[in-house]
Each structure stands twice: as structure tokens, then as C-alpha cells.
Swiss-Prot record:
Keywords: Antiviral protein, Endoplasmic reticulum, Endosome, Hydrolase, Membrane, Metal-binding, Metalloprotease, Nucleus, Protease, Transmembrane, Transmembrane helix, Zinc. It catalyses: Hydrolyzes the peptide bond -P2-(S-farnesyl or geranylgeranyl)C-P1'-P2'-P3'-COOH where P1' and P2' are amino acids with aliphatic side chains and P3' is any C-terminal residue. Residues 300-314 have a biased composition (Basic and acidic residues). It comes from Mus musculus. Residues 40-81, 145-170, 217-347, 406-475 are nuclear. This is CAAX prenyl protease 1 homolog. The gene is Zmpste24. Zn(2+) binds at residues 335, 339, 415. The metalloprotease domain is constituted by the two C-terminal nuclear regions. GO terms for molecular function: double-stranded DNA binding; endopeptidase activity; metal ion binding; metalloendopeptidase activity. It holds the Pfam family Peptidase_M48.
């Protein structure tokens, strides 16, 4: 009777109290679940000190131990940063941080001559202050991750000056995009009438497509140097492979990722008949950063930021041989182009937009509920931006967790399909060796807890991918 009496008493609380309590309870439930999973994986890092028999042919004990220690350090960092983030978020909610920041934004606006009727301007000030707070509180964690953990394990290639310039530039670019887009979205919601959710969804769709279109050409070059892949065998073979599957390739770039880190990557971008491929220089074993003269001849300007530490960066990269041979790079690209050929990119866009439409529709249903605002300290006003924050971040959090897990499962399926596509191109053997090299270069730990990997891994564990490719090689 005592337990049921407590449950009945809980329902006697006002609706806003129940909403607030449910949000906090769910947040901590997710945090404890994530911590439980992380501790399961951490136990694997601690106890698996020898190379498993099935890995002896592909990984030496030295690399295995390095990856184990690297992942242990990352696990420790993740625990403390996650705990801080959860406690900080709880304190912000308990002590009315959101309404306080909204009032502070209003005071700034009042001092500039803008009254309460200028809600959109107040919303932009709120966003600026909120993102500034987030950047400042996250800075120590980012510094520790970069200059302690990544540095310790040989991945960091940045100086402190380069890091800070980069952080400031990212913040400025983010504000230049976030503030005008947010202002237009809020305006559309306010004037859109009963069907504002349709107009808001269409607006965000257009914005996302524009950002995807301009990112690699206008935004990414603000932070990294992109150089056309030199004429040669690799470029020729990439073009031949692209043509064989009707991929409308227009350009191939190499990005100087080694200026920041030893981690490697490759991707493609662009719409319709204007596709481009980007390779990280850390992915290419047979590639060196062009000197200044070569850059000028190719028409590409070198970055000004961090030029003083270029030699230091190059020295670090040369001291650590990494990357893939041309045949392996082609296999990796065969996998990436498989995502395009199999329609994975389009499917992800469709899923994203269906989710976006559903969220805006539900937002339209819930935005008039005063108890949602009251739950977070807004008793006398219902600002649109605050409504977006409350509903999208807090009320939708259970749905977001379920959706995230489903997308993770789908992503793993897509990865297997892309590997199979590379196999059909005759790249199984080279992709097999490339995956081993990339895992070694990035110090990925090849042993994982099944529950942790099921919940978190957007890519299948290395052993599962290798087994599938091994069967393909035998075929």
C-alpha cells in the first residue's frame, strides 16, 4: 500500500511539476544506462590484455596494447566529461538557468532600446549567450582531450595557438549561420498561421540542402586546405571506377587533415551531376603535402593559420608511417561509392526529413500547452524559441533515444551492404587489408562488448566486417 500511495501522491502534483520530474528522471536514466554500457566496455579494455587467437594473424601485440591503453584513456575521459555534463544540465534545470538567461537577454535588449515586443531579437541574444556559455564550459574538456589524451597517443598535431584560433573561428562561423537561420525560422513560425509547421519544415529542408551544397566549397576551406589530387595513377583509377558505376565525379580533393590529427577519413559530397570526392592526406600512404610552389601552381592558396607549425606537423607525420596503398584507397572509395549507388544517402535524407516533419507537427500540437513552459520556469510568457528548446530537447528525448538506436542499427546494415558492393567491384582483398590498416592507424580496439557495440556502433565491429570480407575473398 505504501508504494501505491506514493504513486498516487505523485499524481497529485501540478502538471508542470510532473513534467519537470519526468524530464529529470529520464535524463538520469539515460545517463545511468550509458554509464552501465561504458563500464561493460571498459571491463573489456582492462581484462583483454592479449591478442585474441582470431586476431593474431592481423594485429601484433604492440599495436593491440597501444589501442587498449588509448581506449582506456578515452573511456576515463568520457566518464568524467559525461558526469560533468549531466550534473551541469541538472543544475541548470533545478536552479532556473534557462529563464534566468532569457531574462538576462531581455535586459541586454532593453539597454539597447528593444522592448519585450522584439521577441526575435531577444531570442537571438539568448542563443548567442547560450552558445557562448556552452563553448566556454566545454573548452577545458576539449583542451584536455586534444593536448593530453590525443597528444599522449600521437594523434594531435595542433599547437595551442592553432587550436584557439580554430575554436574562435568555428564559433564565429557558427553564429553567422545559426543566428540568421534562427531568426527566419522564428519569423516563419510566428506568421505561418495554423500550418506554420509545414512552412517551418520546408524552410529547414531548404537550409539543410543549401548547407550541404556550400559546406565543402565555402565553409570547410575556412578551416582546412583542400588541394586537387595530383594527376597520376591513383586519380586515373578513381575516375575509371567512378565511371564504371555511373558516379558523376567532377573533382577529387585531398584535405590536409594531418595539420590537426593523424586520424583518417574519406567522403564524397554534392548533388546531382556535381559529385566530388575528398581524401584525407592521412589516408594516403603514397602522398606528401605539396610545398608552397606546388600550391601556387595548382591555384590553391595555403592557409595562413598555423603556417608556423607546418614543419612540426610534417615531421610528426613522417615519423609515423600510416595510410593505405593506392589499391586499398580505391577499395575504401569503392565502399563509400557503394553508399551512393545503393541509395543510402538518399534514404538517410528521406528519414531525416520525415523525422523533421513529424517533430514540427508535434511541436505545433504542443506549443500551446502552458504547463510545458511553466515546468521550466516560464509562468508569464511563452517565447517561441523556448518552446522549441523545451519540446525538441526535453519532451522529445525518449523519442530521440529510440530513433537514435534505430538509425544506429540501420547504419550498420548500410555498412555491410557497402562492403558487399566493394566486393562486387573486386575490392574485397584490398578492403580487408585497408580496414586492418585504418584500425591500426586510428588505434581502434577490435574487441567489444556485445551490448555496448549494439547500442553505440554505427559501423559493425572490425571482426564482423573482416569475416564477411574473408568469405568474399574465398568466394
Amino acid at each position: 500500500m505504501g508504494m501505491w500511495a506514493s504513486v498516487d501522491a505523485m499524481w497529485d502534483f501540478p502538471a508542470e511539476k510532473r513534467i519537470f520530474g519526468a524530464v529529470l528522471l529520464f535524463s538520469w536514466t539515460v545517463y545511468l544506462w550509458e554509464t552501465f554500457l561504458a563500464q561493460r566496455q571498459r571491463r573489456i579494455y582492462k581484462t583483454t590484455t592479449r591478442v585474441p587467437a582470431e586476431l593474431e594473424q592481423i594485429m601484433d601485440s604492440d599495436t593491440f596494447e597501444k589501442s587498449r591503453l588509448y581506449q582506456l584513456d578515452k573511456s576515463t575521459f568520457s566518464f568524467w566529461s559525461g558526469l560533468y555534463s549531466e550534473v551541469e544540465g541538472t543544475f541548470i534545470l533545478l536552479f532556473g538557468g534557462i529563464p534566468y538567461l532569457w531574462r538576462l537577454s531581455g535586459q541586454f535588449c532593453s539597454s539597447a532600446g528593444f522592448g519585450p515586443e522584439y521577441e526575435i531579437i531577444q531570442s537571438l541574444v539568448f542563443l548567442l549567450l547560450a552558445t557562448l556559455f556552452s563553448a566556454l564550459t566545454g573548452l577545458p574538456w576539449s583542451l584536455y582531450n586534444t593536448f593530453v589524451i590525443e597528444e599522449k597517443h600521437g594523434f594531435n598535431h595542433q599547437t595551442l595557438e592553432f587550436f584557439m584560433k580554430d575554436a574562435i573561428k568555428k564559433f564565429i562561423v557558427t553564429q553567422c549561420i545559426l543566428l540568421p537561420v534562427s531568426a527566419l525560422l522564428l519569423y516563419i513560425i510566428k506568421i505561418g498561421g495554423d500550418y506554420f509547421f509545414i512552412y517551418a519544415w520546408l524552410f529547414t529542408l531548404v537550409v539543410s540542402l543549401v548547407l550541404v551544397t556550400i559546406y565543402a566549397d565555402y565553409i570547410a576551406p575556412l578551416f582546412d586546405k583542400f588541394t586537387p589530387l595530383p594527376e597520376g595513377k591513383l586519380k586515373q583509377e578513381i575516375e575509371v571506377m567512378a565511371k564504371s558505376i555511373d558516379f558523376p565525379l567532377t573533382k577529387v580533393y585531398v584535405v590536409e587533415g594531418s595539420k590537426r590529427s593523424s586520424h583518417s577519413n574519406a567522403y564524397f559530397y554534392g548533388f546531382f551531376k556535381n559529385k566530388r570526392i575528398v581524401l584525407f592526406d592521412t589516408l594516403l600512404e603514397e602522398y606528401s603535402v605539396p610545398n608552397k610552389d606546388n600550391q601556387e601552381e595548382s591555384g590553391m592558396e595555403a592557409r595562413n593559420e598555423g603556417e608556423g607549425d607546418s614543419e612540426e606537423v610534417k615531421a610528426k607525420v613522417k615519423n609515423k608511417k600510416q595510410g593505405c596503398k593506392n589499391e586499398e584507397v580505391l577499395a575504401v572509395l569503392g565502399h563509400e561509392l557503394g553508399h551512393w549507388k545503393l541509395g543510402h544517402t538518399v534514404k538517410n535524407i528521406i528519414i531525416s526529413q520525415m523525422n523533421s516533419f513529424l517533430c514540427f507537427f508535434l511541436f505545433a500540437v504542443l506549443i500551446g500547452r502552458r504547463e510545458l513552459f511553466a515546468a521550466f520556469g516560464f509562468y508569464d510568457s511563452q517565447p517561441t524559441l523556448i518552446g522549441l528548446l523545451i519540446i525538441f530537447q526535453f519532451i522529445f528525448s525518449p523519442y530521440n533515444e529510440v530513433l537514435s538506436f534505430c538509425l544506429t542499427v540501420l547504419s550498420r546494415r548500410f555498412e555491410f551492404q557497402a562492403d558487399a558492393f566493394a566486393k562486387k567491384l573486386g575490392k574485397a582483398k584490398d578492403l580487408y587489408s585497408a580496414l586492418i590498416k585504418l584500425n591500426k592507424d586510428n588505434l581502434g580496439f577490435p574487441v567489444s562488448d556485445w551490448l555496448f557495440s549494439t547500442w553505440h556502433y554505427s559501423h559493425p565491429p572490425l571482426l564482423e566486417r573482416l569475416q564477411a570480407l574473408k568469405n568474399a575473398k574465398q568466394d
